[in-house]
Amino acid sequence: RQELFEKASNSTSDIIFLDLEDSVSLGDKKKARKKVIEAINDIDWKQKTISVRVNSYDTTLIEEDIKDLLKLTSDRLDLLMFPKVSSDKEVFKFDELVTAYEKKFKRTKKIGFEIIIETTLGLININQIALASKRNESLHFGSADFAASLGAKTTSIGGTNKNYGVLDDNAKNRRFFLNDMWHSALFKIVLTAHA
């Protein structure tokens, strides 16, 4: 919605991501893509970094997302965000498509990549994924889809789970301390990104 784009452009955020994936129903995908392209071109984003989360690799929409974004947006577009990445093969394909469209549409600014790890396979393959393209600028973790890929029940996105914790070592009157159920996955992503 236009008012949300305007609100984002006037915020104190330094990076804005516009969504074509989870927040958009299947029947509204093309309309949303058109609105995002218009927003990138028409709104004064000031010095903000602009990223667009495209549809996932396993859909027929991703190539059209990439093509239209690179054909129809100004150099104001900085990054493409790729959800549910599970292998380096996917990143190779993204790089191949983006490189071809940058050349075809004579884009002068190289587009960077943001990679979202949202599956168990993605976490297992994270080292190869991180090294798959020189365009990779950041790694993200999607806890809800990751939980779904595990078949785990999650009652909240972000924050703590009241049923996940540790007990202190005191044998009597042991106290329960909340823990982050995604700490291990997050730390692996941080280590990989840092390396």
Residues of each region from the PLM?
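Expand to "…catalyze enediolate/carbanion chemistry for C-C bond making/breaking, isomerization
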Residues: R1-A195
